[in-house]
């Protein structure tokens, strides 16, 4: 993966961003912080948004499109969040719900997560924001933030369930 100016090469030349699927190694690599907030970053965020919407996703993290940077997007019920260099400040409660992932097409599993979170993150202009979200949005924020740490939703599952999903995804990858 060739990188420049804190984002990635090729993002401005009209190439469509491709969602990477497990077992692509970029998905397990902790992402690097974003250091430059400029027009290239804003363009990349918009290209990520287009890729997420094209796949009917609720969230997308930069590693899912092959860019190892701490950038994530979440959209739900008309709300849109850009999370750059996010940091979990506080969490409360507990919820269990079904999760899916664009990097695991057609795979869903019950995952336990906090019910409420406070997250600090920059937007694409570099402005620091604090988001307090609950229920589904808390789940989506944490799912995308996990991607930035090289953690996948299947890592929250029992070893047996995780192994079954890994095997299924590896077979799919081999068939491509």
Language model: regions and residue ranges:
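Positively charged
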Residues: 2-176
């Amino acid at each position: 993966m060739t990188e420049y100016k804190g984002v990635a090469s090729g993002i401005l030349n009209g190439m469509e961003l491709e969602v990477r699927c497990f077992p692509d190694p970029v998905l397990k690599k902790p992402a690097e912080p974003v250091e430059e907030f400029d027009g290239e970053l804003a363009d990349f965020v918009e290209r990520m948004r287009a890729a997420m919407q094209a796949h009917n996703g609720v969230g997308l993290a930069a590693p899912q499109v092959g860019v190892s940077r701490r950038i994530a997007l979440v959209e739900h019920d008309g709300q849109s969040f850009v999370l750059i260099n996010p940091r979990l400040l506080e969490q409360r409660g507990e919820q269990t719900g079904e999760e899916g992932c664009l990097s695991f097409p057609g795979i869903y599993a019950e995952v336990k997560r906090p019910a409420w979170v406070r997250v600090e993150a920059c937007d694409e202009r570099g402005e620091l924001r604090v988001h307090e979200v609950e229920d589904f949005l808390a789940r989506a924020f944490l799912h995308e933030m996990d991607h930035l740490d090289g953690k996948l939703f299947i890592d929250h599952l029992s070893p047996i369930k995780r192994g079954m999903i890994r095997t299924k995804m590896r077979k799919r990858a081999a068939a491509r």
